[in-house]
């Protein structure tokens, strides 16, 4: 746990909610409280704290809204539906959140994020950040690409695509692909194959790979064409991708630390296992 510079100043708060009825109700309550509270100033511009209301999808959207301000912003999530990995409060705990924010001294919990650089055949480089994962797929035909780790060719991949996830993203699409669940205090990336072809002619490792922070992953497609690139909940169609590079970003996402913060393993248990009979 670390702490942002805290001077006791008025906290600038942005409230981001999805369109569901319960989310709108929670947002309305927060607006009504904060607008008359001298300790808070409601503003979506240059906020100190971003409150996301909905679920993990809404938190991902909030992250991308403020991804260029991560060194100044802390996030807090309220879930109004299913349990989320990035949300510490339920919709009936709004009063608890308000009380904790009034007592807040700038403490934060930080998680690593993914940096992606996509090079096109005309030399342009498209850069992006991901909180969960970035995937590359070729829908028309089998994707053929070299997987390079630290400038050394590791394997020639043939299949539907490749997913590279962060530790917190390891519980999302990566897990559905058979990847491992990685604790977010481990600064590493996870490369997981999507429906790889393995036979006498074509072979890949066939299992997820954990890549430490100091290492770099490169994916070099061997065929021109249209590739589907997904960055968290955003999807792009890019033509003639020549290289995709993956790194752990120097910046992290920061969450407001509070007594209500649920441990990572508790979140995993609640999401995938539930109550255990004694």
From Swiss-Prot:
Compartments reported by the entry: Cytoplasm
Top enzyme category: transferase
Alphabetical keyword list: ATP-binding, Cytoplasm, Kinase, NAD, NADP, Nucleotide-binding, Transferase
Gene3D superfamilies (UniProt xref): Probable inorganic polyphosphate/atp-NAD kinase, domain 1, Probable inorganic polyphosphate/atp-NAD kinase, domain 2
One family name in Pfam for this protein: NAD_kinase
Entry's EC annotation: 2.7.1.23
PANTHER family per UniProt: NAD KINASE
Name used for this protein in its record: NAD kinase
């Amino acid at each position: 746990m670390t702490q942002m510079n805290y001077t006791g100043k008025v906290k600038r708060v942005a409230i981001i909610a999805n369109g569901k009825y319960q989310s709108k109700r929670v947002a309305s309550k927060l607006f009504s409280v904060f607008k008359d509270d001298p300790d808070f100033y409601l503003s979506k511009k240059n906020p100190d704290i971003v409150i996301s209301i909905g679920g993990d999808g809404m938190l991902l959207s909030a992250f991308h809204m403020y991804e260029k301000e991560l060194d100044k912003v802390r996030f807090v999530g309220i879930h109004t539906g299913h349990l989320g990995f990035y949300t510490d409060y339920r919709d009936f705990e709004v009063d608890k959140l308000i009380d904790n924010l009034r007592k807040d001294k700038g403490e934060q919990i930080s998680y690593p994020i993914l940096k992606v650089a996509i090079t096109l055949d005309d030399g342009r480089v498209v850069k992006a950040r991901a909180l969960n994962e970035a995937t590359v797929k070729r829908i028309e035909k089998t994707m053929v690409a070299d997987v390079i780790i630290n400038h050394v060719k590791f394997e020639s991949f043939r299949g539907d695509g490749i997913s590279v996830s962060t530790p917190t993203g390891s519980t999302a699409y990566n897990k559905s692909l058979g990847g491992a669940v990685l604790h977010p205090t481990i600064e590493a990336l996870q490369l997981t194959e999507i429906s790889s072809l393995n036979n006498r002619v074509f072979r890949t490792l066939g299992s997820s790979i954990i890549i430490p922070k100091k290492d770099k992953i490169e994916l070099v497609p061997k065929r021109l064409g249209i590739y589907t690139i997904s960055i968290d909940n955003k999807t792009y169609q890019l033509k003639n991708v020549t290289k995709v590079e993956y790194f752990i970003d120097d910046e992290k996402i920061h969450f407001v630390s509070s007594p209500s913060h649920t441990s990572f393993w508790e979140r995993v248990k609640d999401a995938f296992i539930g109550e255990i009979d004694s």
